[in-house]
């Protein structure tokens, strides 16, 4: 097996030689206007052997380690290019199928996900079940060799351009809420599925809401055990939060940009203190991410909480430094409008604090009304 240092050096050289073909680094969600460029970039990555780096070779991967994959992500973040086109596909859906999928599901989906034949979206959150995902009400009722799915999902990233989705739905309404959920692989072109874009206060429409009306989903699209979807979903979300480690690079760049913005301006004592504190914390989180390597569940929550809270505070400080300019249509205004969403996406800051308190610090569990 190739050493990580050698692999990282080769990856950096390949990125430098091919960077001109890449779209800008858009993070976890590809904006609709960059889908074509993102697909082309993913195909180029796949052809060069940098897609599914830590996946088994029999499923189209390189058979390397998670540390090799982290090295690839780091080099991409430093270069300012996407490490994958479809994070939901390669990190979430792919990881779930590798761990819980039948041989038939793995054969059908994994190679197709690496080469962009299958593009995935996440169908978890609902209007009344976001952070409290266990309260979801979308139902999937068994009817012979199929499930009939009815309900609504929201905050679905990439729903408009995805042809597959990972879906959590309630299959046993009589069971305790976490025990009656199942996990499905859902074709997005089934009759009865309607996708509508959601306009955000930034003016963008990164997310969609998805409606299911008498959708007939084949029973063999169930992933993992019947009524065992909560465990599958939690494994998926841990992968999502672990993927945030490369956001440290983006945070570092944002702080460098803010330092340049502050040059030549008369900052207050409070603003100088806030800037120094953010830079110090950013250095600490960078060291933590580099030391951590593959991130376990609790550490992923710690890193996710720290980075998103720092992103929020840095956007506020940048707006304060910019002064009246922050009210104009530009990067400062966009950053201030976008920042609050980071404390919600991928699990709210409140949820991350509960995970850290209960699993890392051993504090009493938060009271659950449904268990009373």
Functional labels for PLM-detected ranges:
Residues 1-87, 108, 112, 244-245, ...:
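Amphipathic, small/basic residue-rich leader segments at the start of a protein or domain
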Residues 2, 7, 193-286, 342:
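Glycine-rich beta->alpha junctions and the first turn(s) of the following alpha-helix
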Residues 8, 67, 71-72, 92, ...:
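Glycine-rich phosphate/cofactor-binding loops in nucleotide/flavin-utilizing enzymes
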Residues 116-124, 168:
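A short, Trp-centered hydrophobic/proline-enriched beta-strand micro-motif
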Residues 129, 154-160, 201-202, 341-348:
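Glycine-rich phosphate/pyrophosphate-binding beta-alpha loops
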Residues 145-146, 150-196:
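A short core secondary-structure module
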């Amino acid at each position: 097996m190739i050493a990580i240092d050698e692999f990282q050096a080769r990856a950096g050289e390949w990125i430098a030689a091919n960077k001109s073909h890449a779209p800008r680094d858009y993070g976890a969600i590809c904006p609709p206007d960059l889908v074509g460029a993102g697909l082309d970039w993913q195909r180029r990555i796949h052809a060069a052997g940098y897609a599914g780096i830590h996946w088994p070779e029999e499923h189209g991967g390189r058979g390397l380690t998670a540390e090799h994959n982290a090295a690839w992500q780091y080099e991409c973040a430093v270069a300012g290019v996407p490490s994958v086109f479809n994070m939901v596909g390669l990190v979430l859906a792919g990881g779930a199928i590798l761990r819980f999928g039948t041989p038939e599901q793995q054969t059908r989906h994994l190679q197709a996900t690496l080469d962009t034949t299958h593009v995935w979206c996440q169908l978890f959150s609902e209007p009344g079940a976001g952070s409290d995902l266990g309260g979801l009400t979308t139902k999937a009722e068994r009817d012979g060799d199929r499930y009939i799915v009815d309900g609504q999902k929201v905050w679905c990233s990439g729903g408009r351009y995805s042809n597959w989705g990972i879906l959590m739905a309630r299959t046993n309404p009589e069971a305790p809420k976490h025990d009656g959920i199942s996990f499905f692989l859902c074709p997005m072109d089934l009759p009865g599925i309607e996708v509508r874009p959601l306009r955000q206060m930034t003016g963008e429409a990164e997310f969609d809401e998805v409606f299911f009306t008498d959708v007939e989903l084949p029973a063999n699209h169930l992933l993992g055990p019947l009524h065992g979807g909560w465990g599958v979903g939690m494994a998926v979300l841990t992968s999502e939060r672990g993927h945030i480690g490369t956001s440290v690079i983006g945070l570092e760049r944002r702080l460098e940009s803010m330092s340049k913005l502050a040059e030549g301006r008369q900052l207050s004592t409070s603003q100088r203190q806030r800037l120094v504190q953010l830079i110090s914390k950013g250095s600490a989180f960078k060291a933590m991410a580099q030391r951590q390597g593959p991130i376990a569940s609790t550490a992923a929550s710690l890193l996710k909480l720290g980075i998103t809270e720092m992103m929020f505070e840095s956007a506020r400080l940048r707006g304060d430094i910019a002064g009246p300019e922050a009210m104009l249509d530009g990067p400062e205004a966009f950053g201030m409008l976008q920042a609050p969403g980071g404390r919600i996406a991928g699990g709210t800051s409140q949820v991350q604090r509960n995970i850290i308190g209960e699993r890392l610090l051993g504090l009493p569990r938060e009271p659950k009304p449904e268990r009373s």
